[in-house]
Amino acid sequence: MATEFQTFNEDLSLTSQTECEDSARAILAKLRPEWTSSEIKFEYFSVGITNKIFSAGFGTEHVIFRVFGHNTSKVIDRENEVTAWRQLAKHGFAAPLYGKFNNGLICGFLEGKSLKIEQMRDSRFHMNIAKRIAQLHASVPTNGKTLVFEKMQEFLKQLDPKFEDATKQEFFVTNFPQNLAAEIEKVEKLVIKSKEPVAFCHNDLLVHNIVFNGETKRIEFIDYEYAFPNYALYDIANHFCEYAGVEGTPDYTKCLTKDEKWLFINDYLHFKDSKNHCDVRMKAMYKHLPLFEATAHLFWAIWALVQAQNSTIDFDYLTYAHARYEQYEKRFQKYIGSVNHH
């Protein structure tokens, strides 16, 4: 079976299933020449809110096609995605990457099913998720520099201060500050001051990106579009924000309790470095947690504003951006309150 990374000059249609499958067959004729074209079976997964994802199967073998959503290169660095993915695959944290086409990637199939939100909220899964995050942070090398604030500023450059739709424009002006760049800088100063360590992070551990293999009982992460070196605590904080769910309006009352967050951080530290696991580190992480939750909310709020202007996917990005921005303000104030209190 060919394992070297291959490039294909094909565009897969986001709108026509027939055209999309014809292009996929053309790619598979080169990537998997031993597969009988007419017997290839396609199965669609539409859980991502950015891309179109489907599998192509022949016999017991499968490969996954990820077709990038319209205009997503405005919010995703595709070069970085390939580099990060290959590095993660090398360390056993991602399915193998077989190749790329003009508007997407082809990768291996990870056995298992994405967690459902009820499962993710089940405390029995928390330890396994914490363990896998710890393993990721401990295993993949970085240069110690984070890109998270740079990415936010890049998103802002893509954001047009004027929405074409008057109703959307009014909503934007009413619910968001004029100077979002100042918000980023305000948070960045405090985050740098926290001196939290940097690790190679997934940065998007929502429910769809966490796969559980019922046979091996292992947790795996998928979808490394936003993977880059970042503060380790950001990865955890961002994951905590995702307990609210993605579909419809997020429900932040469903997030973990203080005690559950404490236990999760305790498990994470135990698996990451059991020899140096101490209360001081634990308390520092817990103290800084609202600041990093605020950072994650701000990141996705700005991301969603850009998506609201560019994405063709049927999702109310503007309402989502507002929900995230409100949480950003709440978590930021909680952090400021706790710091001033001590």
Predicted region positions:
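ATP-binding pocket architecture of kinase catalytic cores
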Residues: 43-179, 190-197, 215-216
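Juxta-kinase regulatory segment immediately upstream of eukaryotic protein kinase catalytic domains
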Residues: 1-43
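Active-site acidic catalytic loop and adjacent metal/ATP-binding pocket
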Residues: 46-65, 185-240, 245-247
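Active-site activation/catalytic loop segments of kinase-like enzymes and analogous catalytic loops
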Residues: 233-276, 294-312
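Glycine-rich, phosphate-binding/catalytic loops in enzymes
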Residues: 81-83, 237-240, 319
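Helical subdomain adjoining the active site within ATP-dependent kinase catalytic cores
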Residues: 169, 277-342
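A general structural signal marking secondary-structure boundaries and capping sites
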Residues: 32-35, 133, 137-144, 163, ...
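Short proline/glycine- and basic residue-enriched helix-capping loop/turn segments at helix->loop/beta transitions
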Residues: 180-184
